[in-house]
Amino acid sequence: MAEAPTERARVRRHPERGIYDPAAVAAILDEALVCHMAWVTPEGEPRVIPTIHARIGDTLYVHGSQASRTLRAIRAGAKVCIEATIIDGLVLARSTPKHSMNYRSVVVFGAPREVTDRAEMDEAQRALAEHVVPGRTADARMPNEVELKETAIFAVTLDEASAKVRTGPPLDPDEDLALDVWAGVIPIRTVAGKPQPAPDLRPGIVSPAYVEDYRRPGG
């Protein structure tokens, strides 16, 4: 998709970095571990929260709570803006104003709906768990009835989404190239450490392959 799906989804700052291809948007959302969802309360107060998300097709599911102000705002008709970012590198220029980051980000606009259908709720819960740790639902217990009643799941279509990506070296002006200052990129990536068993783990339970080999998609 060469054009922005809507005017408000169009990338304005550095438009050359804007990407509207649904596959590119999906790949970033699938790799990003968390997202931030912003909305405005009925009283006109801005809010933003970090949370987990999962994508199924062209629908983005976001985890929430039945006791949250988010749910009350959405039930009152609030629209949301959801953002996710992956940092790929620190870009060090020869002057501090020219420093930057290499990143991949997605912004989604939409009117969320509360998921109430039980089958869709189950599918979304499974997708959320698999988004964080692929393979986890093969052995971990899924939510019981009490836990489901405490949980809110919001669904937002990806009809109005855009990605923005920066890659490459610093962009120093010609007059700075003679400075005796190191310039370049420090690559950044998410790396899992050695798994730490729970202190109350029963003897004989070994960490599964999806724990020992954990990595983010694309990482």
Task: Identify the function of each model-found stretch.
Residues 53, 110-112, 158:
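A structural signal for short, well-ordered beta-strand segments
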Residues 5-61, 72:
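An N-terminal domain-cap segment
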Residues 59, 79, 105, 111, ...:
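Structural motif
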Residues 66-127:
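Short, structured beta-strand-loop surface elements
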Residues 1-9, 116, 120-219:
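C-terminal edge-of-domain segments
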Residues 54, 68-70, 169-172:
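Short, surface-exposed beta-strand-loop junctions and turns on beta-sheet-rich folds
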